[in-house]
Structure formats: C-alpha cells, structure tokens
Amino acid sequence: MTTSLHIGFIGAGRLGKALAWSFSAAGLHVAAVASGSGPSGSANASTSARELADATPGCEAMAAQAVVDRCDLVFLATPDSAIASACAALRWRAGVSVVHCSGVTEVDALSAARDQGACIGGFHPMQTFGDPAAAVASLPGSTITIEAGEPLNATLVALVGQLHCRVNRLPPGMRARYHASAGFTSQFINALFAEAARVWESWGATEAEALQAMLPMARGTLASIESAGIARGMPGPVSRGDVGSVEKHVAALAALSGHSLNFYRTLCASTIPLAVERGSIDEDTARRLHAVLETEPLQAPPESRLQGGPASPASQPVPPLE
C-alpha cells in the first residue's frame, strides 16, 4: 500500500515542495529530502531542503545518498539537465524505485539506477508550479503523466489517485513530443495575451486594462471548450464565416508596427479547419477566408474531436485509495 511507503525527494525547488506537500496532505509519508545541487547532494542539507522538511510532518533534511538509503520511492526533482548526472552519482539497490519529474527527459536518463537493480519511471504533473503553495491547491483534478514498468507502474497509479488527479500513460520515446504539446496550452497563452495587450497599448490602454477585459473572455472560451469540445467550442468571426470582420481585422493590424498581422494571419488560418469541422462554414467560405489572410489551407483536424464524450482511456480519473 502507498500509505506504507517511505517517500523521498532529491531536489527541493518549487516542484519538489509542491509534490512533497501534496503527498503529505494526502496522508502519505514523505520521510526525507535533499538538495538537488551538487553531484550527490550536500552533506549539510541546503536551506531549501530544510525549509521543505520543516513544513512537512515527519520529514528530515539530509544528504542525497541518505535519502536513497532511507526511502522506498525517490523523486528526483532536479533540473532536466541534472537528472542523469544526479542519478549516476548515487548508489542504488534492488527494492528501491526512482522516478524523475521531467516532462521532456526520457526515463532512460535513470539507467544508472536501473543497472543497479532499482525500478525507474517518470512522474510529470501537467500543472504550473510558480508558487508551490498555490500548486498544492490547483493540483487535484490535474493530469499526471506516468511511465514505468510493473510493479512501479501500479504504485504510481495509486499515488495519482491519492492526489485526486488523472493518469496519463505515455509510451517510451514520446516525452519530448508530449512536453511540446503542453506548451500550446501553457506558456504560449502568455504570448497570445502579450500580443493582445500590445494592440490595446496602441490606443493608450494599459496591460492591466487589457487583462481585465480579456481574462473573463478567455475563461469563457475555456468553459466552452470543456463543455462542447475544441471545434464546437470555438467562438469568433471565423466560426461564423464572417469574412468581412476578418478583412477589417487584417486592415487594422496592417497599420500597426511589429508582427501583429503575421501572428493574426497564422492563428486565424489555423481556426478555419475547425470551423469547417464543426460545419459552421463551407469550403467556399474557407477559401475566401484564406484569400483575405493570404494563407494556404491547412489540413483539417480529425473528426474524432467532434465526438465530445468521456476522456480517452489514457487520461481517466483514478479513484483515491481507501
């Protein structure tokens, strides 16, 4: 049972803190933590490790090797570039498991532990961790991508359930592609808001005023996507076949300096196949829109997106253990 696990963390940054606190709040035993800096962790616990331990009942700060020696399951929450070297610097054994928390790094980066008999895997929460305390509150309901063989896979699935999250299983070799996909709905949103705010600034509005207006609209769009799906939940003139409005947008943005017009053309063109998919515009309207945008038609997305319905088997909610 996961409740009997001694869980350890090597790396006490924002991700390590958020996961450790989440596990502890779920009734799991986070027994030890070490700094992720240095080849094998500092013999004297770093300030961040001590802070994490002090805020986690039953947890002690110690050197990285001591974490491995004490715990059944070790989370390697170091920067991506340090995963392989941090793992290789430690002595592992049969009966212990180690997982890294990177979305982009392959699990084979932990091969040094596997070669010594340990089980290895990946455990990547699809959530942002700018503020660890806020991340603890936002983690339930999120998806956690796991990759491991048995018996570690079953343990990780149970842990995801304890956190009231969803499991996403990833086959080997797909981590970079998977992690890139997350960017479209994470940091790329910042670029979209930045571009919109720059347009608002052209008439003297501030970024704060732009955000105050745009955030409720963005939340409404996300709610529509959640309830109706990607294509059917899309608002805006393209979804209505309003070629005239798009023409006016192009003319207005052409008068601005910078790359706003090219950005608009690229994004607007990518919504045309979605409007065709949902059946709200015909092929002739799609061609007219592309002509206004001076873009080439894109391949239409698969029809399966129209189906809505339950989540795919790869991303289902997992009930918590009793």
Regions found by a protein language model. Name each.
Residues 1-63:
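NAD(P)+-binding Rossmann beta1-loop-alpha1 motif at the extreme N-terminus of oxidoreductases
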Residues 3-4, 95, 141:
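Phosphate-coordination loops involved in phosphoryl transfer and adenosine-cofactor binding
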Residues 19, 26, 47-55, 134-227, ...:
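Internal alpha-helical scaffold of NAD(P)-dependent oxidoreductase catalytic cores
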Residues 35, 63, 100, 122, ...:
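Structural signal for conserved beta-strand scaffold positions within catalytic alpha/beta enzyme cores
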Residues 55-134:
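Rossmann-like NAD(P)(H) cofactor-binding subdomain of soluble oxidoreductases
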